[in-house]
Amino acid sequence: MSVVTATPPAGISNRNQPDSCNVLLSVRNVQKVYGAREAVTRALDDVSFDICEGEFVGVMGPSGSGKSTLLNCISTIDTVTSGNIILNGLDITQLRSRQLSKFRRDDLGFIFQDANLLDTLTGFENIALALTIKGEKANDVRAKVDRTADLLGVADVLQKYPRQMSGGQRQRVAAARAIVADPKLVLADEPTGALDSRNAAVLLETLEVLNEKLNATIMMVTHDAVAASYADRILFIKDGKLFNELRRGDADRTDFYQRILEIQAFLSGKQGASSAVGFVASHVSALRK
């Protein structure tokens, strides 16, 4: 496993990942290469890690580091050049086209930066779509949508169309759509990127609810340290490699946020204690807004 790690502070261990856990996602020696001969770009370079069932994992890194490529490979939007991605015992790199469609429908939930709701469907219909595609009975669909909407606080917008909702409401409806069919893994791609700080906080609290109350396994790509501080563990990617791993453990979210910023400062070239501390200090107020 090609990882350059920093030793975690003493006494820190991940909240949701004990020494022995049920590994849901296993990424093994994944490489993704674009181009050929002299014009080769190695977007992912021997990346390996595990995610446990019920874990909330963030993925961070500079622009062009490979984090979006990693998400695309796990979601089967893109294919790996070599290596294996195993979800719940199934090696998805070996699936054929028809099998991939079933895999995406049954095992994955998606939350995108722009919600991606269908404008001609109500909130209820957007959430129900995942269940309808699976052929579930109408009574079961209504019960599951209502239960999920109540949990995520969007019951009052079920009869509204996306254009009648706020940005935060649209993203929470998207989160409900992602989880209503009980997927094995929820993939979130910059889910707060199009939201103001207030609506971003509401969405992140929604993801926390999914993780803590439904034991949803979440993998979230983000550039935002505030968003990442809601996760149990952060994987940092640099130049296509898994550069570092940071666990929250028993730290509160503010402390975890500061540690994330320190690594971000290092990755961005702001090395040294004084610059890292200054970088942290300039951002701490974001958690208090």
Model-predicted segments: where are they?
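Short coil-to-helix segment of the ABC ATPase nucleotide-binding domain corresponding to the Q-loop/switch region
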Residues: 121-129
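Conserved beta-strand-loop-alpha-helix hinge in the C-terminal portion
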Residues: 241-266
